[in-house]
Amino acid sequence: MSWSLLSNIIKKFTLLHHFQPIGYIYKYIHICTLNHSLGSCVLQANYSIQNNLRSRTLFIQSEITYSHSLESTHFFGILIFFNIKFRVFNRINDPWTVLDNVPEVMFHDRFFINDFTFWVDVLQEAFRMRRWIFRFEQLVVNPSFSNSQWRIIF
């Protein structure tokens, strides 16, 4: 690895960490991944539930493991691999009852840290358009994000 490449990586990391601690960045990466996962998996899991999502308050419990490594691609970034397992809970009837006909969803994603601002823009646009999800609340703060819980309002 050339010194200029390494220097660019360090500069990007330093700039990124200057205003956000790494745990906060992981939280937002988690949110973006969660948003994408719901859009591609859960919303299509059951059509009758999909029709009623906007009147429900759901809980998402996620179990996340990740590893990161330097990637020598044109992105010159840090590649983070997520293995995420979702269970969807119905908050209205019983806070801890899994919704019928919604299986556990395994979702695998990869995320370049230097694409972070792009995904934040996408998420903000989703909020503005009120598409899929328009509010997140973290219920359990877990620095390792190994078993975080989020409330998502539709």
UniProtKB/Swiss-Prot annotation:
Additional information: Partially overlaps GLN4.
Record's protein name: Putative uncharacterized protein YOR169C
Organism: Saccharomyces cerevisiae (strain ATCC 204508 / S288c) (Baker's yeast)
